[in-house]
UniProtKB/Swiss-Prot annotation:
CDD domains: TMPK
Domain of life: Bacteria
Annotated residues for binding of ATP: G10, L11, E12, G13, A14, G15, K16, S17
Pfam families noted in UniProt: Thymidylate_kin (PF02223)
Organism: Alteromonas mediterranea (strain DSM 17117 / CIP 110805 / LMG 28347 / Deep ecotype)
Swiss-Prot/TrEMBL keywords: ATP-binding, Kinase, Nucleotide biosynthesis, Nucleotide-binding, Transferase
Record InterPro entries: P-loop_NTPase (IPR027417), Thymidylate_kin-like_dom (IPR039430), Thymidylate_kin_CS (IPR018095), Thymidylate_kinase (IPR018094)
GO BP terms, alphabetized: dTDP biosynthetic process; dTTP biosynthetic process; dUDP biosynthetic process
Protein name: Thymidylate kinase
Enzyme class of the recorded protein, top EC level: transferase
GO terms assigned for molecular function: ATP binding; dTMP kinase activity
HAMAP family: Thymidylate_kinase
Amino acid sequence: MRGKFIVVEGLEGAGKSSVIGLIVKALTDAGMRVEQTREPGGTPMAEAIRECVKHDWDETVSEETELLLMYAARVQLLTNKIYPSLNAGAWVVGDRHDLSSQAYQGGGRGVSEKTMTAISDIALNGFKPDLTLYLDVDPAVGLERARGRGELDRIEQAGLGFFERTRARYLSLAENDESIIVVNAMQPMEQVHQDVISIIANYVSQHIDEGSESHKTDQGNN
């Protein structure tokens, strides 16, 4: 049985890392084989691209350059880790996926929808996560949290306006996609974690039930 792909999205300072750890533990405790990924990154080549993307270069990095690097890393990760893991029955938990590009490069950077769609179609061929949790945080609060972690990278230095546009695109995309669940990350972290645990428990329960019904049907046809 094919595994499921669950992705956690959010602005800087939204609390993705702790939520991802929570999801991985919940799935493991439920008996799933779990693989964890991050974007950009997740394979040796994709990690090298990650460093390239985040480096503060002493030259102009165009919106299109940034976008193409993101998709190059994504295709490497899909080909070498995500697709094989899902086909082997593992559940994959991702720190970011295509929604990040749609929000950051499409919303924040202002890359045209035509360009975003064309590149996404070529790179992904319709593939998307089974479930996405978007941790919604006010950009000013998120940036303050990120600063508390240390020096900001090139993207984190983009400014408040950039992150406000990025957040607006995230929310717009979530409104039109039932597989994206918005989690209020402005709540105390304990409440955020409780909300996430509830979402994951319900999702796992539904798909374990589906798997059981499918198995019964297969047995009945034999």
